[in-house]
């Protein structure tokens, strides 16, 4: 059981036939880190409800979550007085079309749309790189059907 759980989405769209991923940069102590929109679950929310809400809050986008893609990463957080807190992040894969991105100023300093290779280079965490790679493979498989 995780001490802390967040849900979010690996969000993509197409620009001139090229798949682009939404990569966000945080604020404050997270300003140096790029990742995917996500946030803590609120009481009574499902994982998908949390993911949809967090994507909307952080990017202004209304997205559609794709069936069949759910990835979990778990790790321990080293916090003062609580060295073994377990953190769980749940990510879905989501698409948006024809919308303007609007960064939530209080939590997001920048949002960029990057192709797979550019996005991979901008992500710092190995877990995020793995999840992006799995999302790209999933989309490549599903478009070949």
Residue ranges and their predicted role:
Residues 10, 23, 91-93, 113:
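Conserved hydrophobic/aromatic beta-strand scaffold that supports enzyme active sites
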Residues 16-18, 29-31, 42, 71-75, ...:
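Short, charged/polar surface micro-motifs in flexible loops or helix N-caps
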Residues 29-34, 101-145:
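Nudix hydrolase/Nudix homology domain
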Residues 54-58, 67-72, 134-144:
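A general structural signal for short secondary-structure boundary/capping elements
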Residues 60-100:
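Active-site segment of metal-dependent pyrophosphate-handling enzymes
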């Amino acid at each position: 059981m995780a001490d802390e759980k967040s849900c979010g989405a690996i969000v993509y769209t197409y620009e001139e036939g090229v798949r682009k991923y939404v990569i966000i940069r945080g604020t404050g102590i997270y300003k140096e880190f790029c990742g995917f929109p996500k946030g803590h679950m609120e009481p009574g929310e499902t994982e998908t409800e949390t993911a949809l809400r967090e994507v909307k809050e952080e990017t202004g986008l209304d997205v559609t979550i794709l069936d069949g893609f759910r990835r979990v990463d778990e790790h321990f957080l080293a916090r003062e007085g609580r060295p073994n807190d377990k953190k769980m992040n749940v990510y879905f894969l989501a698409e948006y079309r024809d919308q303007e991105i609007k960064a939530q100023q209080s939590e997001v300093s920048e949002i960029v749309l990057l192709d797979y290779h550019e996005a991979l280079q901008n992500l710092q965490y190995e877990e995020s790189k793995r999840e992006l790679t799995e999302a790209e493979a999933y989309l490549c498989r599903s478009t070949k059907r």
